[in-house]
C-alpha cells in the first residue's frame, strides 16, 4: 500500500460524517511521504522542535508548537509517543512511529478525541508493522 493510500483511506476517512481538515505522514527528517491536499507546509525548524519534544517531553510546552507558522498550545499527550496541540476551535495530533510522524489537523465540529483516534490508530498499526 502506498503512503498516499494511508493518507487518503485511513487518515482522511469519514468519522460520524466528519473528516480531518488535513493530514500527512512525514519522515523524522521532515520529508513529506504523503499528504492531503490542504496540508500546510512545515518549516524545518518546526520539525526539529517536534522531534526534540518527542526526545525531551515538555520541550515545546513553554513556547507552544508551531506548524506552518501557526502557534498551537501544547496539551497533554503521551510523552515520547504523541503530541497534541490546540488552536482556537481546532487542533493537531502527532503520533511518532519508528520512521515517521503521523499528523492530523482538525477543526470543529470534529472533536479532539476523534482526531486522536484516527491518527493514533494508524500510528499504532505502522508501529506494529515495524515502520
Swiss-Prot record:
Keywords assigned: Actin-binding, Allergen, Cytoplasm, Cytoskeleton, Disulfide bond, Phosphoprotein
Modified residues annotated as Phosphothreonine in this record: 111
Keyword Disulfide bond on entry: yes
Gene Ontology molecular functions: actin monomer binding
Subcellular location(s) per record: Cytoplasm, Cytoskeleton
Cellular compartments per GO CC: cell cortex; cytoskeleton
Pfam families recorded: Profilin (PF00235)
InterPro entries given in the database record: PFN (IPR048278), PFN_euk (IPR005455), PFN_sf (IPR036140), Profilin_CS (IPR027310)
Free-text description of this protein's post-translational modifications in UniProt: Phosphorylated by MAP kinases.
Motif Involved in PIP2 interaction in this chain: 81-97
Highest taxon above the source species: Eukaryota
SUPFAM superfamilies: Profilin (actin-binding protein)
Cystine bridges: 13-115
Ubl conjugation keyword on record: no
Other noteworthy facts: The variability of the residues taking part of IgE-binding epitopes might be responsible of the difference in cross-reactivity among olive pollen cultivars, and between distantly related pollen species, leading to a variable range of allergy reactions among atopic patients.
Similarity comment: Belongs to the profilin family.
Function: Binds to actin and affects the structure of the cytoskeleton. At high concentrations, profilin prevents the polymerization of actin, whereas it enhances it at low concentrations.
Cross-referenced PANTHER family: PROFILIN
Subunit architecture: Occurs in many kinds of cells as a complex with monomeric actin in a 1:1 ratio.
Protein name in UniProt: Profilin-3
Organism in which the protein naturally occurs: Olea europaea (Common olive)
Amino acid at each position: 500500500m502506498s503512503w498516499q493510500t494511508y493518507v487518503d483511506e485511513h487518515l482522511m476517512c469519514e468519522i460520524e460524517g466528519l473528516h480531518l481538515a488535513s493530514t500527512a505522514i512525514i519522515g523524522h527528517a521532515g520529508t513529506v511521504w504523503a499528504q492531503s491536499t490542504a496540508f500546510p507546509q512545515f518549516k524545518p525548524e518546526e520539525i526539529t522542535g517536534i522531534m526534540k519534544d518527542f526526545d525531551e517531553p515538555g520541550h515545546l510546552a513553554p513556547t507552544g508548537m508551531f506548524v506552518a507558522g501557526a502557534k498551537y498550545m501544547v496539551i497533554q499527550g503521551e510523552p515520547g509517543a504523541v503530541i497534541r496541540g490546540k488552536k482556537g476551535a481546532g487542533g493537531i495530533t502527532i503520533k511518532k512511529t519508528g520512521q515517521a510522524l503521523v499528523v492530523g489537523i482538525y477543526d470543529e465540529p470534529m472533536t479532539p478525541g476523534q482526531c486522536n483516534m484516527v491518527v493514533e490508530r494508524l500510528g499504532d498499526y505502522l508501529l506494529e508493522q515495524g515502520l
